[in-house]
């Protein structure tokens, strides 16, 4: 009876997370080549000795989730050491969205049940592009997050201010934290307290730009976000991680960078080649020593 009532089992989260979203940039063949490049031992992306402290995750398009899942399973089957249940897998698989119901008459939508069955572990939700183009609301994102968590999937919820930086730094930070709180609160209220959640802080004005937001701005806003989370739900048992996205890439993590401010990075186009990923991984590994 106890096992029947047990909640969903979530994958363990190491200290630092690097999550790559391919959006709709790659064809299926390029995605398959890309994940094989990530898993290729000669490319030195995934190091066995760092898996308990650094997690790499890939979020491809929906069409290639299954072949990516098969590639990861094949890679795991070739590992010399057996996989412990408490050790994070070498590469987590994610999806770019899901629906807020498990199954039903929802043409074109993506079921969290189906994602779970294809070994998906993380679901990206509420990206600024979906909020702007498709009109997704904070409440819809929260419902999706709850549906994902119900299936043992970790919600990766994108948050970030729309308002641009002003001349007064304290006011800009206050506005940013306030806008993020409006996006965070419904999610925390919808999720079970033992469910993990990842928030990807992406200032909308930094997405797709040549340069990311300034480190001091990110640090101040993320500090405010942590205070907001503590105030909203101080009794939460599930892990809460905060990543930075928004033109994140190589050179952003090392000395003087984001390593002490956030729990990882949400990577986009700057990780579209294997060399870029390797550079970021090496930067993070240096900080873990």
UniProtKB/Swiss-Prot annotation:
Pathway this chain belongs to: Carbohydrate biosynthesis; gluconeogenesis; Carbohydrate degradation; glycolysis; D-glyceraldehyde 3-phosphate from glycerone phosphate: step 1/1
Main subcellular location: cytoplasm
Parts of the chain that traverse the membrane: none
Gene Ontology, cellular component aspect: cytosol
Catalyzed reactions per annotation: D-glyceraldehyde 3-phosphate = dihydroxyacetone phosphate
Gene3D superfamilies: Aldolase class I
GO molecular function, one term: triose-phosphate isomerase activity
Cellular compartments annotated: Cytoplasm
InterPro entries assigned: Aldolase_TIM, TIM_sf, Triosephosphate_isomerase
One biological process term in Gene Ontology: gluconeogenesis
Binding residue positions for substrate: 23
Domain of life, source organism: Eukaryota
Active site (catalytic residues): 127, 202
Top-level EC class: isomerase
Pfam families (UniProt xref): TIM (PF00121)
Keywords: Cytoplasm, Gluconeogenesis, Glycolysis, Isomerase
UniProt keyword Cytoplasm present: yes
Record PROSITE patterns: TIM_2 (PS51440)
Keyword Isomerase: yes
EC number in record: 5.3.1.1
Assembly behavior: Homodimer.
Family indicated by similarity: Belongs to the triosephosphate isomerase family.
Name of the protein this chain belongs to: Putative triosephosphate isomerase
């Amino acid at each position: 009876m106890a096992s029947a009532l047990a909640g969903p089992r979530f994958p363990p989260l190491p200290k630092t997370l690097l999550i790559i979203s391919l959006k709709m940039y790659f064809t299926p063949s390029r995605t398959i080549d890309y994940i094989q490049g990530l898993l290729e031992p000669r490319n030195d992306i995934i190091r066995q000795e760092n898996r308990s402290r650094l997690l790499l995750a890939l979020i491809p398009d929906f069409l290639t989730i299954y072949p990516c899942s098969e590639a990861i399973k094949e890679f795991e089957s070739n590992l010399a050491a057996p996989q412990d249940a408490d050790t994070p897998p070498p590469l987590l698989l994610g999806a770019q969205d899901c629906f807020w119901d498990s199954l039903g008459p929802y043409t074109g939508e993506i079921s969290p049940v189906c994602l779970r069955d294809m070994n998906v572990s993380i679901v990206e939700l509420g990206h600024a592009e979906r909020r702007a183009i498709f009109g997704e609301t904070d409440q819809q994102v929260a419902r999706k997050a709850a549906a994902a968590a119900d299936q043992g999937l970790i919600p990766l919820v994108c948050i970030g201010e729309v308002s641009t930086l002003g001349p007064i730094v304290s006011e800009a930070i206050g506005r940013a934290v306030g806008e993020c709180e409006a996006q965070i609160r419904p999610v925390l209220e919808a999720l079970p307290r033992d469910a993990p959640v990842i928030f990807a802080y992406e200032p909308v004005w930094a997405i797709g730009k040549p340069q990311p937001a300034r480190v001091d701005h990110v640090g101040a806003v993320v500090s405010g976000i942590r205070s907001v989370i503590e105030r909203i739900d101080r009794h939460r048992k599930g892990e809460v991680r905060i990543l930075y996205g928004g033109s994140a890439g190589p050179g952003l993590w090392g000395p003087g960078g984001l390593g002490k401010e956030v729990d990882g990075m949400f990577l986009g186009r700057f990780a579209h080649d294997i060399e870029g990923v390797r550079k970021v991984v090496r930067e993070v590994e240096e900080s873990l020593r």
